[in-house]
From Swiss-Prot:
The keyword Hydrolase applies. Its EC number is 3.5.1.47. The lineage of its organism: Bacteria, Bacillati, Bacillota, Bacilli, Lactobacillales. This is N-acetyldiaminopimelate deacetylase. Catalyzes the conversion of N-acetyl-diaminopimelate to diaminopimelate and acetate. It comes from Lactobacillus helveticus (strain DPC 4571). PANTHER family: N-ACETYLDIAMINOPIMELATE DEACETYLASE, PEPTIDASE M20 FAMILY MEMBER. Pathway: Amino-acid biosynthesis; L-lysine biosynthesis via DAP pathway; LL-2,6-diaminopimelate from (S)-tetrahydrodipicolinate (acetylase route): step 3/3.
């Protein structure tokens, strides 16, 4: 198979868009990707499907004079969203959609892979088609399962995320944090239920929960550096069964978002302190569950990111945009905590929609523009 053309990449993207699958269920997507990859020039390609993560694909391109292995990651899963675009290539899987643009991500990766399979790079290139970015922390699972060992271990790692706010094909990046880290919060208050007329014989968890919720609102404003940024949102509270019975149990669910891992751990500790205080003050049991999984802040490596930005800024064919941090989460942050690297935005020119929207409709011109910009950077990075 020759280098994939723009029209071929668009057709691939449209087929991928038709077959979205949820985290760790990406069998049809995996098989379609593998069929395309096996059609590339295999002279210096090694393809690996890890048993530990069977919908993942690793492709290693052997360099002509390798000094390092450069990794490139793309995610492959979709979201439980009912598509409303009315496109002729809309999702054929009810209730599931590529509403975060991972079909664009995969198409760009295939474009890069097809080019370097025909034009042997100087350094080794490792392509990682990752399942389960939207949930289940596929990047963390891959690392902990040891699939990046031996010749499949990257010395540096790169990855993109589409951005509908940026023009099609524009590249956005910044030094420091690109995406926030996220942690799921579950708090269970366990007291004693009773008749509404006799509160002295009960232990009201609703009152305690109200106090705890108000105290949690002070964590960001009074415990976090105001120059930094963090968010705690408590989006769900469940308690009681009827108006005249004091609730013996209350559950609070929410999310933490922070721009550095240090900040997230600081917020975690403050929540622990507050929950312990409420437990003592109201004489009840308070269980706090914090689940970050692999959704660490995406903290770009300073040296590699300076190099990436410099190339993109000085390439007249690239529309480069210096971006601000986003409070959305991305599990590539876990991998960037293990390997130095850079994540960046690829504009897809759909400003009237947003990520995770049922109406997301990326401009397909972004695919070939993304391929060309990243291909140029990788060639430059290898010193060819």
């Amino acid at each position: 198979m020759a280098v994939l053309t723009e029209s071929e990449l668009i057709q691939i993207r449209r087929h991928l868009h038709e077959i979205p699958e949820l985290a760790l269920q990406e069998k049809e997507t995996h098989d379609y990707l593998l069929k395309i990859i096996k059609g590339f020039n295999s002279e210096f390609l090694t393809i690996k499907v890890p048993e530990e993560l069977p919908t993942a694909i690793l492709v290693l391109i052997k360099g002509s004079n390798p000094q390092r292995t450069i990794g490139y990651r793309t995610d492959i899963d979709a979201l439980p969203v009912e598509e409303k675009t009315n496109l002729p290539f809309s999702s054929t899987h009810p209730g599931i959609m590529h509403a975060c643009g991972h079909d664009i991500h995969m198409s760009v990766a295939l474009g890069l892979l097809s080019y370097f399979s025909e034009n042997q790079p100087k350094d080794n290139l490792l392509f990682f088609f990752q399942p389960a970015e939207e949930s289940e922390s596929g990047g963390k699972k891959a690392y902990e399962d040891g699939i990046f060992e031996g010749k499949f271990r990257p010395d540096e790692f790169y990855g993109l995320h589409d951005n509908p706010e940026l023009p099609a094909g524009a590249i956005g990046c910044r030094e420091g944090t690109l995406f926030a880290g996220t942690t799921e919060v579950n708090i269970d208050l366990i007291g004693k239920g009773g008749h509404a007329a006799f509160p002295q014989n009960a232990n009201d968890t609703v009152v305690a929960a109200a106090s705890l919720i108000m105290q949690i609102q002070t964590v960001i404003s009074r415990s976090i550096d105001p120059i930094q940024s963090g968010v705690i949102t408590l989006g769900k509270v469940r308690a009681g069964t009827i108006r005249n019975v004091i609730a013996g149990q209350t559950r609070i669910e929410g999310t933490i978002r922070g721009l550095t891992q240090k900040m997230i751990l600081q917020i975690d500790q403050r929540l622990q302190d507050l929950c312990e205080g409420i437990a003592r003050s109201y004489n009840m049991k308070v269980n706090l569950e914090l689940n970050q999984g692999g959704y660490w802040p995406v903290e770009n490596n300073p040296e590699l990111t300076k190099n990436f930005i410099s190339y993109m800024k000085n390439n007249p064919e690239v529309d480069f945009v210096e971006t601000k941090p986003k409070m959305t989460g991305e599990d590539f942050g876990f991998l960037l905590a293990k390997f130095p690297g850079t994540m960046f935005w690829l504009g897809v020119g759909d400003p009237d929609s947003q990520l995770h929207s049922a109406n997301l409709n990326p401009d397909e011109k972004s695919i070939i523009r993304g391929v060309n910009a990243i291909k140029g950077f990788l060639i430059n990075r290898m010193g060819i």
